[in-house]
């Protein structure tokens, strides 16, 4: 009988997701399913993890991230082998705000991959977890979703959707065996933010952010700001009056 914790990571090739996987496997061998769009990249991640944790069962799934029916089938196939203990929904992209303003297709794509797609995956897993009355759904949002800002409001709008969705899902599952964790990273040193690092931005290490996520998911913490200082920063930004906020170049 397989008593290993069953973990699914959607968007497993993201730097944060990969480091979360490493930390989970360092704790104990697991039954790990890696979901991504690029088969070669997922296999590279899986190969590395198998070396790190030979006793773990690691499988890969190449999947569609935008088509609802394909997402439904992907999740149904994953849960056929048993109830999922943890699903981390980690995929997304960091679009250029100017591109989104000038190109409606780019705008739509940014909203879809950062907002709609994570919600669809979460809802598909929620259906199974509701029946089992067991499991944790962890969604990676962003501090950008806390208040719309001119520098990234399309991305922020998508992540704001994830935030509201997660809040509603938490309300739905309150008092049950299903936990919902909303993760709000600040700017983190990953390939997705390489252009920000080049501009001198202060970025959190991916290792520290992943550590906070894994610890928060284990305890079922409802909201994780990573690093924690972003809770205070975003509380201030959320509560700034418009006449002050509108003068800021952020």
Predicted regions and their residues:
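Active-site loop immediately N-terminal to the catalytic Tyr-X3-Lys motif
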Residues: 147-153
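Conserved glycine-rich cofactor-binding loop
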Residues: 13-15
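Active-site helix of classical SDR
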Residues: 122, 158
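Rossmann-fold cofactor-recognition segment
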Residues: 51-69
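Conserved mid-core segment of classical short-chain dehydrogenase/reductases
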Residues: 72, 86, 92-108, 151
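C-terminal helical subdomain
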Residues: 182, 198-235
């Amino acid at each position: 009988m397989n008593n290993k914790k069953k973990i699914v990571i959607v968007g497993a090739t993201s730097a944060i997701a990969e480091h979360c996987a490493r930390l989970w496997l360092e704790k104990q061998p697991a039954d790990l399913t890696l979901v991504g769009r690029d088969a070669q990249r997922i296999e590279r991640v899986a190969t590395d993890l198998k070396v790190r944790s030979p006793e773990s069962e690691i499988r890969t799934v190449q999947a569609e991230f935008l088509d609802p029916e394909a997402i439904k089938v992907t999740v149904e196939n994953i849960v056929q082998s048993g109830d999922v203990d943890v699903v981390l929904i980690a995929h997304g992209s960091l679009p250029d705000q100017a591109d989104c303003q000038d190109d409606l297709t780019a705008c739509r794509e940014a909203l879809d991959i950062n907002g709609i797609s994570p919600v669809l995956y979460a809802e598909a897993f929620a259906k199974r977890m509701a029946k089992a009355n067991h499991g944790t759904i962890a969604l990676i949002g962003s501090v950008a979703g806390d208040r719309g800002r001119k520098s990234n409001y399309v991305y922020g709008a998508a992540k704001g959707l994830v935030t509201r969705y997660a809040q509603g899902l938490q309300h739905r599952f309150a008092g049950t065996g299903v936990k919902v964790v909303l993760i709000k990273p600040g700017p983190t040193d990953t390939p997705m933010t390489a252009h920000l690092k080049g501009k001198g931005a202060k970025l959190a290490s991916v290792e520290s952010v992943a550590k906070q996520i894994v610890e928060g998911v284990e305890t079922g913490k409802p909201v994780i700001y990573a690093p924690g200082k972003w809770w205070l920063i975003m509380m201030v930004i959320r509560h700034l009056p418009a006449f002050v906020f509108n003068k800021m170049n952020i």
